[in-house]
Design a protein with these regions (language model features):
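Disulfide-bonded cysteine-rich modules in secreted/extracellular proteins
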Residues: 1, 32-44
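Buried hydrophobic-core signal for structured, non-transmembrane domains
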Residues: 10, 52, 100-102, 200
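Short solvent-exposed coil/turn linkers within tandem alpha-helical repeat scaffolds
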Residues: 11-25, 53-64
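TPR/TPR-like alpha-solenoid repeats
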Residues: 27-30, 34, 69-72
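Low-complexity, acidic Ser/Thr/Pro/Gly-rich terminal tails and inter-domain linkers that flank the onset
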Residues: 70-93
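Mature extracellular/secreted ectodomains of secretory-pathway proteins
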Residues: 147-148, 155-253
Length: 257
């Protein structure tokens, strides 16, 4: 790297010197040499890639180094999957959680972001999709599978609650802009899961009060025929609508009939 810097300084200072041709030839060889890039890649840090870009401007692998820097700063999980830089597996784990595993497919650490509103789309038409209720960020430091624990709620209210046999793919939600505004207000309000779930269903499903009644809890000892206890009652529904209203979301479909 010192040679390349010295050559640049020489060419800047003596653009018509006797050794310009040799200097340019040497510089071209340095900018085509993979060794400095591979050294930065092996370190796998923002500092290493930044130093490489500073020492070797115009290097043939400059674009790869800049891409790696962006990956280390943090990228949307959907973009990383689409660019085949990470692999993700996910399956159902009830109404409040989704089991997610991820691994990197590139030879350096990757910081993945799962933004609010990201959808986990069920492979089964009978199971609900899941939606992120808070942004999560994870660093994949090795090429082994790592378990992630994102905060989610269910969408597509009429469908079944996902179980371990239901797998998901990841994509951006068509409601993502509204959810990005809504969920920080939900978090700030410090409300429980029933209110959070109600708020999400209002956004993703235009749910009214009767619709929200489908969320029930059933004691473990209860018989199969037992209908369960409604979780989203008037207080939870009203609180969810208040938060949606604060977020500027149309709640005219939420009726108390």
């Amino acid at each position: 790297m010192y040679w390349n810097r010295a050559i640049r300084e020489f060419l800047d200072r003596y653009p018509s010197g006797h050794f310009v041709s040799k200097a340019k030839s040497r510089q071209a060889a340095l900018l085509a040499d993979d060794v400095p890039f591979l050294a930065a890649q092996q370190k796998g840090t923002e500092e290493a890639f930044s130093q490489f870009l500073s020492d070797f401007p115009g290097h043939k692998r400059e674009s790869e180094a800049r891409s790696a820097l962006k990956d280390l700063e943090g990228r949307d999980i959907v973009d990383l999957v689409n660019e085949k830089k990470i692999e993700v597996q996910s399956q159902g784990d009830g109404i409040e959680t989704v089991s997610v595993k991820a691994r990197r497919l590139v030879p350096y650490p990757v910081v993945l972001r799962i933004p609010v509103g990201t959808f986990f789309v069920s492979s089964s038409e009978s199971a609900q999709n899941m939606v992120m209720t808070a942004e999560s960020k994870y660093t994949l430091r090795s090429d082994g599978w790592e378990s992630l624990s994102p905060s989610v709620a269910c969408a597509n209210r009429p469908r079944d609650i996902p179980g371990s046999s239901d797998s998901f793919t990841v994509q951006r939600s068509p409601n993502q802009a509204e959810l990005k505004v809504l969920m920080p207000l939900v978090e700030k309000a410090g409300v429980g899961f029933a209110v959070r779930q109600a708020a999400v269903w209002i956004v993703t499903d235009n749910a009214d009060y009767d619709d929200l009644g489908t969320l029930v809890s059933t004691p473990a000892y209860a018989p199969v025929a037992f209908g369960g206890t409604r979780e989203i009652n008037e207080y939870e529904a009203v609180r969810a609508m208040q938060i949606c209203n604060e977020a500027g979301i149309d709640i005219t479909n939420c009726r108390f009939e």
